[in-house]
A protein has these predicted regions:
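Extended, well-ordered alpha-helical scaffold/bundle regions in very large, multi-domain proteins
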Residues: 3-59, 141, 149-168, 249-255
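Long, C-terminal catalytic modules of enzymes
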Residues: 370-431, 435
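Segments forming glycine/polar-rich beta-alpha architectures that bind adenosine-containing cofactors
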Residues: 93, 101-159, 195-198, 214-245
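Polar, glycine-rich mid-to-C-terminal structural blocks
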Residues: 45, 49-98
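Extended, charge-enriched "interface" segments that sit outside catalytic cores
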Residues: 143-204
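Residue-level detector of conserved catalytic or cofactor/ligand-binding positions
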Residues: 432-444
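Long, K/E/R/D-enriched contiguous segments that form extended
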Residues: 23, 30-31, 191-301
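A donor-sugar binding/catalytic signature common to diverse glycosyltransferases
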Residues: 309-354
Length: 445
């Protein structure tokens, strides 16, 4: 608007018409703290002309809203771009865009039902869905040469230009020779990743065990803490049952936390400490290991994705906009275990119950539990495994205590880890015991 008004000399109406026919708004989060707002005084001081234009946009927008809502001042206040001495950037985006979309079917419904419900009721035709996607050539052809070669051998190279051709691989789902080659590709990728980890960290990985992967930004809603709770539960079980028949498993984490996000950094520290304590018990560590990789980036991801066997997509239902790691990992043959959230919903529709393992509450069930009054303390007092896990956090892991993580779960549990714990742990156990041929048939879909 500033360029069109000040540099090009357009009048307001012509400039605004160009703006609203040029811009579309893609929302990427339902987290209130991630919907950016700016302090009015700061903006006025640093960007006085921009702020003056925003004020005029808001005045005209609110006047228009008063007309179309029949004078509903409460709704207009909620939709206002400037409110409580803050400039609400998401509201500005909605006002200035010809269309608004989420990045998965579920997310797009959520923004219509809650995040931008007022805007949707005023202009429903502007809202649509555009599900996220990935550059599959990077995450398959460039990252997983062994699988690419096997696919080319089996179905030709048409899939390199047309991803839908990958469906032709289904016909080999019961072909033992192809499944054997698929298993060999996966093992080679695991060995390559293990070599990278050893060269960079000095940690040796057991390639005969399962590689269970959760790689994404560290945030409580993504529930790395739920994953950690399950690992601690396994650790306690193995301490009490050292000779138990336990399928070896390595849990691999890689993520970064926002600089000022204290709780996320505590969770990172806790995961790292779990891995370090496990190393001190070599016999147990052969069965259960944890690796937290620093400086997560695309080049590391290109080595990790092909080596992964279980993909953890475990956000609380209704909190993940889409996710793309779920797509990258599944493309490379990892079995997905996840909640009915984000793009998991559409993946489930595409591949069916046998090829993605859904656990936990649905979004309506989450909302219902919140409305009824969620009480994590009650679950803590009645659930022996959860209680033992938190007691371990209180007592210490590798010499460090994690009272703040434990208390946050016990007294608030904003993202309902306790409520989904049994379902999550049960799915973990069932997934581990899926036979190798079945796992390979699944990933050929």
């Amino acid at each position: 608007m500033r360029i069109l008004l000040d540099d090009c000399g357009y009048d307001w109406d012509k400039a605004w018409n160009i703006i609203t026919n040029t811009f579309d708004y893609t929302n990427h989060t339902v987290m209130a703290e991630a919907l950016e707002t700016w302090d009015v005084d700061l903006m006025q001081r640093i960007l006085p002309r921009i702020y003056a234009i925003i004020v005029e946009i808001n005045n005209r927008y609110c006047a228009h809203l008063m007309e179309v809502t029949g004078g509903d001042s409460e709704k207009v206040t909620r939709m206002s771009i400037i409110l409580d001495n803050r400039v609400k950037m998401a509201n500005l985006c909605c006002a200035a865009s010809s269309s608004v979309n989420g990045v998965s079917k579920l997310h797009s419904e959520i923004i219509k039902d809650s995040v931008f419900h007022d805007q949707y009721t005023v202009n429903p035709d502007a809202f649509k869905n555009v599900t996220n996607g990935i550059a599959y050539r990077r995450w398959l052809l460039a990252s997983n040469q062994g699988l690419t070669n096997l696919l080319t051998e089996c179905i030709g190279d048409g899939f390199k230009k047309d991803a839908s051709k990958l469906a032709d691989f289904k016909k080999f789902a019961t072909d033992k020779s192809v499944l054997d080659k698929l298993a060999a590709v996966k093992l080679a990728n695991k060995q390559a990743f293990a070599k990278y980890v050893y060269n960079t960290t000095g940690t040796k990985l057991n390639c005969n065990g399962i590689f269970d992967v959760q790689v994404k930004r560290l945030h409580e809603y993504k529930r790395q803490q739920l994953n950690a709770m399950n690992i601690i539960a396994d650790y306690i079980y193995l301490l009490n049952n050292p000779d138990a028949d336990f399928v070896p498993k390595t849990y691999i984490f890689a993520s970064k936390a926002a600089p000022g996000y204290y709780m996320a950094k505590q969770i990172i520290k806790m995961i790292w400490c779990i891995g370090e304590e496990l190393k001190k018990n070599p016999k147990l560590n052969e069965k259960l290991a944890v690796v937290f990789l620093e400086d997560y980036k695309v080049t590391l991801s290109e080595i990790l994705m092909p080596a992964s066997e279980i993909s953890e997509q475990i956000s609380l239902a209704g909190t993940e906009a889409s996710g793309t790691g779920n797509m990258k990992l599944m493309l490379n043959g990892a079995l997905t275990m996840g909640t009915y959230d984000g793009a998991n919903v559409e993946i489930h529709e595409a591949v069916g119950d046998d090829n993605i393992f859904i656990f936990g509450m649905s979004t309506p069930e989450v909302n219902q539990l919140k409305a009824e009054g969620y009480n994590p303390e009650k679950i803590y007092n009645s659930h022996a495994v959860i209680k033992s896990v938190l007691e371990k956090m209180y007592k210490g892991i590798n010499g460090a205590t994690f009272e703040e993580v434990a208390n946050s779960l016990r007294h608030a549990d904003r993202y309902m880890c306790f409520a989904d714990f049994d379902s999550y742990r049960g799915t973990q156990l069932s997934l581990i015991h899926i036979s190798e041929p079945t796992r390979l048939r699944c990933i050929s879909y």
